[in-house]
Amino acid sequence: MMYFRRKAAVLTAVGALAAMTATGCSGSIDTDAVVATVGEEDISLGVANFYARMTQGQYETYYAGMMGTTGEAMWTQDAGEDQTYEDSVKDGLMESLQNMYLISQHAADYDVSLTDDEEKAIAEAAEQFDADNTDTAKETVSGYKKDIEKYLELVTIQSKMDGKMREGVDEEVSDEEAAQKAMKYVYFSYTTTDDSGNSTELTDEEKDELKSDAQELADRVAAGEDISTVAEELGQTANDLTFDSESTSPNEDLIAAADALESEGDVTDLIETDGGIYVGQLTSLLDRDATDQKKESIVEERRQEQYDSLLEEWRNDTDIEVHERVWNKVDFEDTGVTIITSETDETATDGGGSSDTSEDSGAAE
């Protein structure tokens, strides 16, 4: 069976949306079909497809190359738990879309609504997208005015609700709860790397010599010498690290040994690992800057926990149903999307935003 890959350059001047190039053999879909229900509210396939294609374009444009693959091949990769990468991403997209609707349904509880200016901006954005793109392009991504407007309404409400849903958490954090210590450590590696990046493991004799160097450093630093100076003399580098008992990097045994030290200036024993040897010196029992940053992190964690808890509560109180047969019509493998910009796509910007279509042939059994 033969098919053609359609290319449609999609242009938008709105920052919330992305310019896209769509490729594939996707046919028209019923954008009014119900892909899911959240409480009493239906999610249309048009809104779901537009949101999915926007996200798909980001993955294919920015991540496929980093993963050393093509957009097509990326979606068929195994994501574990008997899922392809496409299955996994689509599951996340559907959950995120449901969350948008849940948040919108509770916006009135927080006195959140769209302003006249926001509604006007959304309408203008949808109209501009509609005017700038061909029917072929809009068909591929469901880029129609009603679907774009609904999508932008949802993301705008979600943005305005974000802070509201995080308000009211306890922002008091004690030094004891957030305490961060500081150390300097030296890592004596059992491998060397040449200028070409090739690694070579030391011989047993060389490892013994390295262990002697590590012990010399530990002894001299314990006697009062500066760890950075001694490390440099031995051809090594002393690294700075702030940590607490829950830290795991660069090595859990090093963290545990340093955390057990009672006084600033104390030195750990040699921490031997499969890859080398660590020696650490405690430099501060309470690093002020790191502790204050940890306090901010703890407060932000509390805000996030409250946000997640609210969403979970709303989910539990709401009937949610996904119509899989409809959702399956959104297929990433056969229909690709690539983010483009007007600066790099002359065809898209010619004539005030017209879009171009072309065809690349492909075959499938």
Where are these regions (language model features)?
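Second-shell loop/turn segments in exported
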Residues: 33-38, 79-94, 103-113, 143-148, ...
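Solvent-exposed coil/turn segments that connect beta secondary-structure elements
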Residues: 41, 48, 53, 188-193, ...
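C-terminal motif of bacterial Sec signal peptides marking the signal peptidase cleavage site
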Residues: 21-24
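Bacterial N-terminal signal peptides that target proteins for export
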Residues: 2-12
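Peptidyl-prolyl cis-trans isomerase
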Residues: 212-254, 289
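N-terminal targeting/tethering segments
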Residues: 27-142
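PPIase-associated folding chaperone regions across multiple families
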Residues: 29-31, 134-209, 215-216, 232, ...
